Amino acid sequence: MIDRIASGFHPFVLPFLAGMFFVFGYCIFGVIKILLQLPRADRLQFYKSLVTPETAVKNVKDIFLNCLLHVKLWKRNPMLGFMHSSIAFGWFMLIVLGHVEVILFVPERIKFFYYPIFFNYFVAEADSTVQGSLLFFLMDFFLLVVLVGIALAVVKRFRSLIFGMRRTTRPSLLDLVGQYALWAIFPLRWLAEGFTAHISGGSFMTIPLNWIARQFLGNEFNMLPTWWAYSIALSVFMFVLPFTRYMHIPAEMLLIPMRNAGLHIRHARKGFARAEIFSCPSCGVCIDACPMSVKKSNLKDCTVYLNRHIRRGHEKRVDEISDKCLLCGKCQAVCQVGVEGPTLRIAQRATRRYNIEQDYSRIDVQPLTEAAMGSKVLYFAGCMTQLTPRIPRAMESVLKKAGVNYVWMDRDGGLCCGRPMLTAGKLGEAKQIIRKNEQIIKDTRAHTLILSCPICYKIFKEHYNLPGVRVIHHSQYLDELVKLGKLSPIKGAASVVWHDPCELGRGSGIYEAPRSLIGRCAELREAGNNSAESI
């Protein structure tokens, strides 16, 4: 391969360069803004993680698997996964192989940012080599992979049910501009490289196209408009990218190392939350998953639209959508990016200011009796369990049968775990309640706290500071008692379906203990939607 243009430049590359410099500048500014919004401790933690070998390897692995191969979508629907990964990974390989071509054949041109993108215009094939033929084949192969992905994307735009999606998001005008520009990029690249294949070489995709084109368009000047069109399509896509759903492409590459560094949402709009909001791909997978979406009027309140309105600064709609959520976490479970919809909503609620201040610091809770102070096991039923008296009565019976020395912490009433205040965004008030409960538990010197309510379990596990105290759900504790031989359930003929509670399953990752326990007592059958996708 040799240069056929001495200057190594043609004006048609200018639209591409303008778009590339714009999107690079925008992303660099965005990254700096997000990092500066992080608390100093989080920022230092993030920087440290980047130079930690284990975390660095995990970052590369996760970016490759999630940003290029879209493994989560493959697991959800193979056709949907193939569509996304063929475009992302195929485009990535075209860029990589383009750089390989420049380095191998015209290394002095690698300094030109645009050369690997428009390589076939600027070079001529002097003689055929094995290296060149292999690269031509690979370039055509990955171009075909991307074109297949684009074709599937066009089909999905009008027939999403084929890809397992009953509903998709409504695209904005700029989303449509970006989408059509993306769809145009690779057919135009195929045409452009096809027009020059008799000069720069090609393979099974470009050479046949070149032969057909030369039958009707013999003038070689006809090839230039296609290269202009290819460059302009790239430029349009990059100029609109920051203002469309496609911003998730660069944003997710920042979100992954931030998440692997152990960062969390601390503000509704800043820092880590901002990275999550811009990483939302607006694919609409969360719409079908949301239990509220069974009513058509609720479709506009799903997490994907919350992220969209936050990005656009539509404060009224953000407040409305933040309230219209059961916080079940199913949207987060199915999201390919892992956007924390419930946490974003709670953080948004926390930004509100109320005219009435609530102060729980003066609550005086009656301490447990002296007899309870020596008990090693505490049982906390919780507000919701108290509304179903059979549950705590059954727990009492079973614990006595197993000979467990326990105390029912909230038998005669007690403080709530703090969940209602937390989900309302009243974090200060919730902390006051939590501190009171912590003191009561610490005073008993108990080493185990059993909870029946999945909501209470998650709150105690994640928000309480109880060193030396094992927090456990009653299904786990009873399963342990059975395995230790302290309980001997008799298996009956009943057939039982277990519903995974949102807070116990998706929220806390406890799936096996309840099933193990039920399986010893009855025939266990699985529901259609279970485990992480339980309704």
Model feature map: region roles:
Residues M258, S293-D323, G338-I363:
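Non-heme iron-sulfur electron-transfer modules
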Residues L97, A184-P187, A213-L217, R266-A268, ...:
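Iron-sulfur cluster-binding electron-transfer modules in prokaryotic oxidoreductases
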Residues I95, I103, G194, S200-G201, ...:
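Flexible loop/turn segments at secondary-structure boundaries
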Residues N219-F221, G271-A275, R308-E320, L481-V482:
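Active-site-adjacent structural elements in folded domains
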Residues M1-G271, I287, R349-R352:
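Membrane-embedded alpha-helical bundles of multi-pass integral membrane proteins
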Residues I249-F272, S297-K316, R393, P514-G519:
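Short, charged low-complexity linear segments at domain edges
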Residues A273-V294, R317-V339, P501-E503:
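Cysteine-centered iron-sulfur cluster-binding motifs in ferredoxin-type domains/subunits
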